[in-house]
Each structure stands twice: as C-alpha cells, then as structure tokens.
C-alpha cells in the first residue's frame, strides 16, 4: 500500500497541458499543490496559524515566491553558490500572487497565513508566474483556511489583432500587450499590464478574455478541492459588540465628520488622530470596557462610512473636488544643475522629484534570470522616504511596494523610448517621492517622462499616468479621478492607467470587493482617458519636445564599425590594449560582438583621439603605401618595423639598401624611426617591407647591387659590389690557388657559365 494518497487533475488550457497534484509532497503543510504547465513545475504551499496574535489589528498575509536555480539546470553564480535574497522578479511575482488573494480572506480574520511557492523546474517558454498564482490559490482552497476563493489567472497577449492565451516569452516579443488578469468565477480582482499604446477598448477586451480563460483553471481547482480538500476551519468572525458600536458612534461620528471637512491632509490627519484619542477618553470616562484595537476598527468604519456616503450623495470629496477633477498641477524641468535631466512634478499634495542619468552599455544591468541572462539598459527606481507622508520611519532596504511602483512606472515608459540603435545610452531614472497623498507612482511616470526629455532622450511621445478609485454600495457607484491616499484606503478599487494621446501603455487594477462589472471598468477607463489627456496637455505646455542635445555633464557617444575579426586586436592580450587606450584617452570604450564600437566621453577631442587610435589598430597594411615607424627588433636577416599599432612588418636585409648590406646594424638601430614601403602581405597577415624602394639608385648602378666585376671575369655582368673575402662567407675552405685570368677562359664562359671543372660561383647577391 502506498504512503501517499495522491490526487491529480489534468486539463488542456489553450496550447498548454496543465496538471494539478496534491497528496505526495509537503503533506504536513496546511495545503500543498504541485502545478505542472508544459514542464514548468512549481510547488505551492500554505500554512495558517490556528489563532491570531493578541492585539492583532490587520491581516498578516505573507507570500514568498522563490526561484531555485536548479530548475533551469544552473548553479548560483554568487560567492556562496546558493540562492540569496529575492531578485526583483521574485519580489514582483510575490506581489502578483498576494494582490488577488488578500481581498478574499474574510473580514476580521487576523490569523497569520504564509504562502510559499518554489519553482522546481522551468521551461523557458512557459512562465512560472501564472503556475505560481494558480498553485497558491489551489493550496489555499484545499487547506480549509477561511478563504472565499478559488482564484484563477491567465496571461493575455495581443498578436496581429487577436488575443493570445498564455503566450511564452518568444511569442511576447511580437505581442503588443502583456496582461495578467486574476479573479474569482464571479469577478475580476487584479489586472497587471503593459501595452504598446493600445485603445481602452482593446485593453478592456483583454481583461474580459483573460477572465473567461481563468475560469478554466478555477473549475479544475474546484475538482481538486472536491477530491482532496481538507475540512473547513471552524472559524467564526468575532461577534459584533453592539453596545460598544453605539457608544463609539455617539462619541466619535461628529468628530470624524468634522475632521473630513478639513481640506489639508496634515491638518485632517491630525484631527482624526485627536478624534481617536478623545473617543477613547470619553469611553473610559463613561465606564465602558473596551479593547483599543476594537475601537480603532470601529472608528475606521466611521471614517469609511463618512467619506463614502458623501461621495455617493454627490457631495464634494475630501479635498473639495468633484469626481472628475484632477488636482492642480505644477511642473518644473531642469531643476538640478549638474544632473543630466531632472523634473519636479507636483499634483496637489503629491510630488515627485525625478532625475534621469545617461550612461553607456557598461552601465546597463546584468540580470541573472532563471530563464537566461540578459542586460537591461533602462532602469527605473522609485523611493518613498517616511518624510513624504510626514511620518517618522526607518530608512533601509528597498521595500516591496517601492519595487512594485518602480516597475509599474517603467512599464508605462518603455514603449515610448527610442530604439537602441538611435539612442545608444543606458538610461537610469530615479523618482524621489518628496510628498505623497495618493498616486505617487503615476506622478513618477509623468516626472520620469519629463526628466528624460530634459536629459535629451528623444521620447516618441509624452506619457502621463492617473490613478482612479471606486466607491460602490449596492447598485450605486462613483468612479473617482486622481484619488487621494484616504480615498484609496477607504474605497473599493485602485485603478492606475498610464499612456499617451494615442493609447494605453500600462494598466494596474486592484479591486477589494466582488461585483465589479465590465460596465464599471468601462466607465473607469473612459474617465481615466479624460484625465490623462488633461495631464498630457499640462506636460506639453511645460516641455513641448525633448532637448536636442544631451547635458554638458553627460557623456557623448561616438560609434564606429570595425571588422569583427579585429576585435581581439583592440582588446589585446589580457585586455592590455583597450586598458591602455582607456587610460590614455580617458574614454569609456564598449565593443559589440558585431564590431560596433561605442566611445563615451565628455571631451570631444579625447573621443576623436580614441577613434583614431582604434582606426590605426584595426587598419590593414596597404600594398604600395609608405609608412613611418620605429625599428622594434634587429634580426640576423633584417629588422621588424612597427608600421601600425600592433602591426610589425619584416624589412629583409636585401631591402635595406641598394648596395650590399653585411650587417643590419650598420644601417639600423632599435628605436630608429624609418620610412618603409609595403611590398606585399600574405594570407597570414605577414607584411614585407622595403626601405630601398624609397631610395634613388646610386649613379652607375644599372641593376640590383652586385659584387664588383673581377678583371678577366665572367663577361660584362655589371658592378656587383664589394663582396669581401669569400672565406668570410663560406667558412673554412682549403685554398684553391690563383684563378686564371678571365680573358684566358673559353669564349663560352663570357655568358656566365663556369669553365669545365671549375666550381659554380656562390650566389651571394641579395635576393
């Protein structure tokens, strides 16, 4: 009999085969499900604490998505050779899972819940995030933990005018959209998308299409729960203390209503805190026994009731606006004198100081992703310190919220960036939130666009973002434009849309309630477009076009193309050549595999010097061309002359002078600069040089240099030069006696042939 009670459900989902399995692995977890989508395998587990911690006043849900490098057949590249802190992708995927799950836990459930997802195997063409979300939902559904799920999810692409279900990374390259939608069978709860300026109608259609496809996964999870689900927890929400509710309303309602008549955020916040304290004092004086957490929750309910009621009754919002008005906008560019580009974007009480910096390819970020390494040349970082909301807090590592907001702003801007071959810079944008009262991520989009234009980045169009909210009670609802922080907390939806005049580039939606219909989303998108166009108008007024020149403090990029086979010459042994070039010119030099060289420098003269040096290094010796260079080495049979950087040619002893050369050192010394002519090159790159080709032949020298003609010698053969004693050239040889006079030789010898029995003359002339 098997140890395991394994339950498996398999279904076809578009082009993918999906398997849900439980009962074999992680049996001691509250719920554990293995999800396999075309060989991408994830293990999703969930554990819930049986009791809430005393004094707990919020729902402590933690989601950890963890990619194991062995899933892709890799060993971690770190010094410790094991997985370390979460990557940005892991953080973003953890948030992606958290957002649709959190609203489905019942009100008042404060038990700690921990969802952990491990990626165990990865098919690069089947992304793990959708499998992780489905697995987390399934694990919660079978665990028995109070949960109003399950949740389904799907990715939607848009290729050739048609929606595509769960496209892989390769297919996404040709897609104009990457949208993830998650929700229950009844309603959409979360949307995360980037798009290439698509219309609101296309975006809404993708949400509806994705939700329909997600229902396929929900049906499979329900089947798994039917066969493998654990008993539901015996949990009931705490009974409402009606006498306490009445007393809190009696002492607090008027104070809360008065506080929400204050338009200034800081003053309103102070008034609310004072109201909380005064209510507790009044309760104590009245002899009411209460728990601070219970009173705080009841007062928060009064805040929500006050704000929501005012809006649904058509009264002004918290800051006095109607539902469609955008807060006043102030824009200033070129704020910081020595940065490459900067902008200060202020909308009401939300303000972003955004700075753009230009760098080279060496400044791009290397991403060691599970699906494969790549380099990212557009970086967007979002920071929100505690002082932005007038609070005291701890500064430290980047929080998940900051990572998520930065990625949303980046998604909004990427489609409008110039192509890399037109603008070769690495771009880093940093948004410093200096004030926050709602929609700081969308302020970062606006400020980021303006900062890059100030830096001289030729953006295709202006990009703006707006955050929308929703108040819904029964059949009544109101969509709010440009929501405040309080409206976000007290409302039912946070809906962020970014784009241009042509269409949407990013969309993020988080819904806290069920029952959001297609019609409501349609109204929200239309109202968001109206607000976006208003903000774009303000941005165009402040900065109509990008600066045509980059900042004086930014590096200029100069490009040149070389033969890829010459790359090794530019780099040199162990990087010696390029290192010397960098030190000499002060330029940053990047070399592409295709032979494209990018030189970055703030000094044009130094950049030109670097270009000349590289051109010299990669130049080919031209036959017949004259070069000047130093003698780098003396050889017995000639000398090596450096005619180009890294290129030496052979000057043979026979090509030094017209007359006979006995010793190379009689004519040349190491370090001497000489002019030479290239005679020929071979397929191995060897170069033959000549000095004598540049020297006029001495008078009386009719042919190549030869030894002087001996009296009575071999006919009239011209002056052959002083050949010196033969013994010196031929080594020790026996004396041969005195030669007979040339005139006494037979006439046939005059043609140059030796007499009978006479040894052949050695060919001593230089070749």
From Swiss-Prot:
Cofactors that this protein relies on: Mg(2+)
Reactions performed catalytically: RNA(n+1) + phosphate = RNA(n) + a ribonucleoside 5'-diphosphate
Chain sites annotated for binding Mg(2+): 488, 494
Chain ranges passing through the membrane: none
Keywords on record: Cytoplasm, Magnesium, Metal-binding, Nucleotidyltransferase, RNA-binding, Transferase
InterPro entries cross-referenced by the UniProt entry: ExoRNase_PH_dom1, ExoRNase_PH_dom2, ExoRNase_PH_dom2_sf, KH_dom, KH_dom_type_1, KH_dom_type_1_sf, NA-bd_OB-fold, PNPase
Subcellular location: Cytoplasm
Domain S1 motif: start-end pairs: 624-692
Any GO BP: mRNA catabolic process
Comp. bias intervals (Basic and acidic residues): 700-742
Short name of any one Pfam family annotated for the protein: RNase_PH
EC number(s) reported in the record: 2.7.7.8
Gene Ontology cellular component annotations, sorted alphabetically: cytosol
Domain KH per the UniProt entry, residue ranges: 555-614
Region spans: Disordered: 700-767
Family in the record: Belongs to the polyribonucleotide nucleotidyltransferase family.
Protein name: Polyribonucleotide nucleotidyltransferase
Biological source species: Leptothrix cholodnii (strain ATCC 51168 / LMG 8142 / SP-6) (Leptothrix discophora (strain SP-6))
Lineage: Bacteria, Pseudomonadati, Pseudomonadota, Betaproteobacteria, Burkholderiales
